[in-house]
Amino acid sequence: MAFGHRALHYVQHTLCYLPEPFGVALRAPARSRALRGCALQKKRGLALGLALCIAHCALCIDKEPVDYVNPLMGTMSSYELSAGNTYPAVAMPWGMNAWTPQTGKMGDGWTYTYTAHHLRGLKLTHQPSPWINDYGQLSIMPITGQPRFDQDERASWFSHKAEDARPYYYSVYLADHDVTAEVTPTERAAMMRFSFPQAAGHYVVIDPFDKGSQVTIDREQRRVTGYSTRNSGGVPEGFKLWFVIEFDQPLAYCATVSDCSIVPSCMEATASHAGAIVGFADNTRLVHARIAASFISPEQALLNLQELGSRTFDQVMSAGRDRWNDVLGRIEAQDDDRDHLRTFYSCLYRALLFPRSFYEIDPQGQVVHYSPYDGQVHEGYLFTDTGFWDTFRSLFPLLNLVYPDQSQKMLAGLANAYRESGFLPEWASPGHRDCMVGNNSAAVVADAIVNGIPVSDDDAATLWQALTHGAHAVHPTVRSTGRLGWQYYDSLGYVPCDVGINESAARTLEYAYDDWCIAQVGRTLGLPTSQWAAYERSAQNYRKLFDPTTRLMRGRKANGEWQTPFNPLKWGGDFTEGNAWHYTWSVFHDPQGLIELMGGNEAFCAMLDSVFALPPAFDASYYGGTVIHEIREMQIMGMGNYAHGNQPIQHMIYLYDYAGQPRKAQYWVHEVMRRLYQATPDGYCGDEDNGQTSAWYVFSALGFYPVCPGSGEYAIGSPLLRDVTLHLPGGRRVCIQASGDGPYVHSLTIDDQPHRSNFLTHRQLRTGCTLYYRLTPEPHAD
C-alpha cells in the first residue's frame, strides 16, 4: 500500500474517535455518495487558510459501515462477569476460519481478554463461546533473540494503544520482541505480515497445540504443514484441522518441537504437543506468511491457499474491507449520534460471524464439507458454531429478513446435518454438543420456511422428517439434542419436575412453542392437516404449568401436584439460567392466551411492570450457592429483576404491545439500548452469544422485533436511528425514518398511510416500503 493510501486509510479508520467539529459528517457510506466540499472559516492569512482547508476536507470523508465497528466490544469479560464474552474476530462474514490475538493460555476459553497485558500469538480459532471452547486451533507468534516455544516464554507485553482491531485486519506491536504483527483473512486463508527490528534473531513460532499434533518443514519450498487435533467435543474419531503456511523469505533456521523439546534441524515431528520454529536472516526486516486450513485434507488446505491468489497483503486487506462494507451495508444507517452508529454496526458485525461456514470448495469447484457428525466428506453446505437456544430468537430472523441468500444455504446445511447424524443440531460446535435445553431447531426452520426462504423439495421433506423425529426422540449420547423427557411430555403434556430431568419447566415451555413451530412448517409446506394438527394442539401445553395463584409458570410433579416450596426468584431448578419471573413469558406463540390466563391486559401489564419493580433478589441454591455470572449481571444492571444479559427474557419488553400498552415497550426498549449497550470493551450486559444479543439491538434500533419467530410478524418498538435503508434482494428497499425527540411513537405511517397496529408483517417488509416514525418525549395515549 502506498504511503498516501495508507495515510488516507488510517484517517478514515480513526475519524470516528475525533470530537466534533473535527469528526466526519455522519452520512451514507462513501460508495453511495460523492465526497462533499468543505467550507473554510474566515482566513487569517493564505497559509493558515490553506492548512485549514486541507485538514477539514480530509476529515469530511464519508465513513463506511466497517469504520464504525469495534471488534473489541465485549472483550472485557471474565468467568465471574461477562461484558459479552467475545474476542476480536478477524474474519470474513460467516467465514470458516477466524483469527484473534491470544492472551489466554492454551485451552483457556477466554482466549482474549481486554484487561490482559501479554500476547501469546495470533490464533486461528473456531470458538463460538468460552463455555463451549475451541477446536481447529493454531497459534503463530513472531519472536526475536533466541528460539523459544513455551507459551509463557514467547509471550510479549502489548498495549491497546499499539493495537488496531478491525473486522478484516488486526495489528499489534509486540514490545518484548520489537515486532509488529499483522493479519488479514479470507474465508479459509489469511496473510500475515511481520515487521522485524534490526536486532539479530528473527523467528516465527508455529504452535498447533497439544492433545495430538504434527508438523513438517519443507525448507526448499519455505513451507510448514501439519495438523491440530485439539478440540472440546463434538467431533468424530480422526478429526483434524490441516494447515499449510508458506513464507516469502528463505528459512535460515528450522526446528521442530516435540512435547516442549526444541530439536534444531529436525524437519518433522508428531507428538502430543508438536510445533515448529522457523527463522530468517538477520537482515530480514519484513516477512509475509500465507496460511490456509482445511478440515478435509492437507491437499484441500493447499487448495484453500489459492483464495489468496497472487495478491499482496494490502490487496487482501482491501478486499476484506470491501466485503465487510458490502455485507454491513445491506443496512445503511445514518444518525446524528456517532455512538449510535458505532454500537449499531459493532452489533451487526457480531451478528454476521455465526453460524460459521463449515464447507469448502473442491478442485472441481463443488461445495463439499467434512462432516463433524460422521467423519466423512459430503457434498453440499454445512454451518456450525451456534446454539439455537440463544439464536432462534432474533439472529436467524435477522438473517432471514436481510440476508436470505445466506439463510438459504443454512437451511440446506441443516438438512445435511440431519442426514449425517439422524438429528438436527441444537448446539453445534462443530458437531452435536450437550448444552442448553429445548428443541429450538424447529423455530429456526419455521422462521425460514414461513418467511419464504427457498428450499428444495428434497430438503423440505428431509427437514419435515427431522422435525417430527426430533420431537419424539432424544440423541443417544447428547441429551440436549432432540427432546429429553419427550415420553413424559407426550403423555402428560409437560415434563415433570420429579423424574430426574432438570430444568423441566423450561423444557416444557420450549417444547410447546417448538410444537407450534412444527405445525407452522407443516401448514406452510402444504402438508395434510392430519400431519401437523396434533402439534398445534400440543402447543397449548404451556397452560399446564401456569399457576393461577401466583400468575407464574411453575414446576409440576408427575402426579399433577405443584413443586413445593416455590420461590419465584430461584434460578435454575425448574428453569434454565433464569427464574419463574423470566420464564413465564416464554409463550412466544400465544401471548393472548397468556394474557387471558393472567386476567386481562391490565393484570398482564402489571406483571410485566413487576419484573422491573422487583429488587434484583435471587436464590442461587441450585448452583450450590455459586452466583453464576448471569445472576450477577442481572443484579448490577439497575433494572430490577429484568435480566437482559441472558436470552429467555429478551423478548419480554415487546409483550406490552400485545396488551395495549406499547408506550411501555417503547420506553424500556430505549432504556435497554441506552444503558446496556455501548461500542466499548465492556459494551454488553452479559454473554453476546453468537449474534443473539447483538441482533436484539439491531432489530430494536430499527424499530421492530420478532417476538415469535415463525409467525411472520414483528412487534413495533421505537427506532433509535434517524434514517435507515434495508437493501433487500431484487433491489427492494425498506426505508425507516424517524423524527422528533424521545422514545415514544406519536405516529407511524407506512408508505404515507397511517399505521395503527402494534405489529408489522414480514410480507410488508420484504416487498419494500417506507416507515416514518414521529417520536415525542411524552407518551401518546395507547
Predicted segments, located by residue:
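Surface-exposed, charge/polar-rich loops and edge strands
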Residues: V24
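Accessory carbohydrate-recognition regions in carbohydrate-active enzymes
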Residues: I61-F396, N400-A443, I449-L509, C517, ...
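Surface-exposed interfaces of beta-sheet-rich extracellular modules
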Residues: A738-D752
